[in-house]
Amino acid sequence: MEVNVRKCEKMTGKLQEKMNSYQRVWAEVDLDAIWENMVHMKENIAPETKILAVIKTDGYGHGGVPIARMLENLDFMFGYAAATYEEAHVLREAGVKKPILILGYTFPYCYEELIREEVRPAVYRRDTVEELAEAAVKVGKKARVHIKVDTGMGRIGITPDDEGLQFVKFIMEHPGLEVEGIFTHFAKSDEADKTSANRQLELFQNFIHRIQSELGLDIPVKHCSNSAAILEMPQANMDMVRAGITTYGLYPSEEVSKDIVPLRAAMSLYSHIVYCKTIHAGQSVSYGGLFTAKKDTRVATIPVGYGDGYPRSLSGKGYVLIHGKKAPILGRVCMDQFMVDVSEIPGVMEGDKVTLLGADGPERITAEELGELSGRFNYEFVCTLGKRIPRVYRRNGEITEVKDYFENF
């Protein structure tokens, strides 16, 4: 036991040492927040309903593998959703065992590997069905699939009508395929008016009833709830729900209630000041000289820019936190640096910590606020944070893992 404790302390020390080297920029991901978000969402759905954690786009920028590993042993977790086979393959390579569903189109080149790895593709094209069936024969293993139904999104999926019913029948004629699930996706569930979402739900439920009554097929996993529906549409729970942005503690929109399920944002973003100087009236800052000082102004340079995914559209609009106070951005955000006004913050020095996302004392910068200021939205902000930013993972206050993309280039 003593040896194990020493090993653990040694590993923690190495991780802390590694994190200390990230002076330019780093993101911290609070795994406890993600765990709590999952538990709170589960409390708001039916006891028998499972959760599918959507961890596409590398877990919305948070890191898909560490999150999947943490959630792997939760009994109410059905599995994970990815956008591409490559994302699913990375999870399998990392030892993730639970089911993985690919939400979009899966290209034929990977069908055999997909079946071997028991990754579930969405199906809605006849050629996909035929090619998957052929691949299943070659591999000697059934391909489990989820049928995608378009009830109003207008993106991908079969129509919930006679033609769609014929497609389901077509799948049933291929013994190499096993229909594990069927799903649709709401277009407007994050709006206060749920008329459209309820109409989609009705179409989906009616179509499922037709599949059962006319084809005699009982599909085990029926799902349509996304993050917004988990919060506000309990009637849409079904067998499983898909937790996307809410997994990471962000709400789908400003119209969705924040009182039903408490969520805690998991990501923070930090840097350090690399240069401080005073400029005088008439001097400009950054490209284009969009900011010109009207008086003596104390300027701090932050070594982060749009090359890291920090939006250029925050130029002259955004702010950071230093010593628990707001420091507004001066002029344009550059590819690798931007400048802030620290005139009203006493004692600012080179090397001081800077909060770009998250809390510092009583002040907080949220992804929602940054999304609004930059003309984007919260999903986009966290998803587009670049690979130059290492991710540091904390559990119970301790660093448990560090993901440095430069080590894998």
Tell where the protein language model's regions lie, with residue ranges.
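Active-site-proximal beta-alpha core segment in soluble small-molecule metabolic enzymes
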Residues: S21, V25-E28, A33-E36, E43, ...
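Active-site anion/phosphate-binding pocket segments in diverse small-molecule metabolic enzymes
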Residues: E2-W35, E86-E87, T106, Y124-L132, ...
